[in-house]
Amino acid sequence: PVFKRELDWLNERLANFPEGMLEAAISHFSSLKICLVREITGSAESGSVSRANGIQFMNGTDAYIVLAAGDTSEKALYHELYHVMETHILGNSIALDQWAKLNPVGFEYDYDYLANAQRDGSEFLQPDTRSFVDTYSMSYPKEDRARIFEYAMTAGNDSLFAASPLQYKLKMLCQGIREAFGLKKSPENFLWEQYL
């Protein structure tokens, strides 16, 4: 029963994507494998954070998404799926080419997960001028975009996307997705566009 429940849960979330979209996203890989586990742990010695809700990695030409089952697995699924989708987006759209220009003047990503864990990014998280979902979004551009996507896909985030800087980032991300996956002319409002 647990296995079936988890598979049903996964299928419900994957059904939020238009037909053919995920297939196009994984066309750059031999396969995509999604694994549900009890927990994901890391260490400073390995250059990773101590705990994670999800990870995405490559093994040869196979893409993997590993999710820690629990309350945060929905956001983790969308976050890690975005990482898989981004390969297709960057190769089929120019919308994200100027991403850095959407950040505050003088801002630089950490380009290091461990350094990011020590960052105080509160100046960029003020409600009226919010430029990032959270401090983790300031680690790498890819994490910034994945964090925006995961929150755009889930309920209850209206106030998060009320700030103009984050709204511009969401618009740019949605434009890139539409361009890359041939959805520019679709009249449908997709789940990730619910806060536009």
Language-model-detected regions and their locations in the chain:
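Active-site-flanking segments in enzyme catalytic domains
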Residues: 31-196
